[in-house]
């Protein structure tokens, strides 16, 4: 299986840029600047193990374990390390293909960074949803004014986490509550909301 995939990757290098490629090929061809922890051999091993229904784990370049958690025809989620994940979503915009990556790191909460590339892994500038912490705060009759005032300064400084939906071109943002004391988490959930956008006709559209 690995030989067949490697052959497909080699053949893809001979194809014109506009021709369709598979998510597997994009993943394997991602440059070191995009995915530094895994070399090509490790990536091929991960996909081979995943396709075989086995735990898709491989040693990364830092000596730790990386794991391929989920893969569809246009989505991939990788646990790069104990504190990091990397997601890839393949989007279409007319005749163009965009590769949108979410790099998330856990340190006092989960913080995400989004990068957009052409199908040859050249970075491009695209209008991505720009969200401030205030937009995640909602009114709630379940939280007293005292608790709201007490939590607000903390909510406004929490990191923002982003996640792709595996089965549709939807990205969801939320405030990462992992760093909050346990007694505050339920209150924070009552005071905050998730915000989702769907990729439609070459742009992100806010979802109700």
Model-derived regions, located:
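Acidic/hydrophobic-patterned starts of short beta strands in beta-sheet-rich repeat architectures
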Residues: 94-104, 166-174
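Short consensus segments that form the blades of beta-propeller domains
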Residues: 78-79, 104-110, 183-188
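Mid-length scaffold segments of soluble, non-membrane domains
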Residues: 96-132
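Surface-exposed loop/turn elements that mediate protein-protein interactions on large endomembrane-trafficking
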Residues: 64-77, 118-127, 199-203
